[in-house]
Amino acid sequence: MQPPTQPGHGAITVQVAPNPIVAQPVTGNVYDFPFDVIVRETGGRAVNITRVTADVTAIGGIRVAQDAYDAAKINSLGFPTTLAPNGELRYHFSPRRSVPDESLFSGVSAELTVDATDETSTATSARTTVTVRR
């Protein structure tokens, strides 16, 4: 779901690839969950990405994981946080998690949210939901 654009301010959309996110076995019950977050600026103004969050839920809406990356953490991973007007950024994440029961892969989804501000400090955000599978 993308919020409405405020005229004269920065706005963003977000996409996750691949969708679904496919768990990659590491060893035993440990998996990597590699995915890219693609952020596009659509309002014609530069924005600064302030936060990327992922809330992972299983059947019944039970939260099974949460990751948050603030601007400092995104920069420490070697990614820029400044997005040019009408530009695009791609962030690659690959969190590693233990999955004690393979049945948890059934009905798992992740809601990804990207928060940003433009040069007038006007906040904008975008979110999308993807599925996760083995």
Where are these regions (language model features)?
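Proline/serine/threonine-rich low-complexity linkers at boundaries of modular beta-sandwich domains
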Residues: P3-T13
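A structural motif detector for short, solvent-exposed N-terminal "entry" segments of globular domains
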Residues: I12-T27
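Short, solvent-exposed loop/turn segments enriched in Ser/Thr/Gly
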Residues: A17-P18, N29-D36, G107-A110
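Asparagine-centered strand-capping/turn motif at beta-strand->loop junctions
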Residues: V39-G43
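Short, hydrophobic/aromatic beta-strand segments
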Residues: G44-T53
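Short aromatic-acidic-glycine turn motif
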Residues: D55-Y69
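Short, solvent-exposed, Trp/other aromatic-anchored flexible loops in extracytoplasmic proteins
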Residues: A71-E111
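Terminal connector regions
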Residues: V99-R134
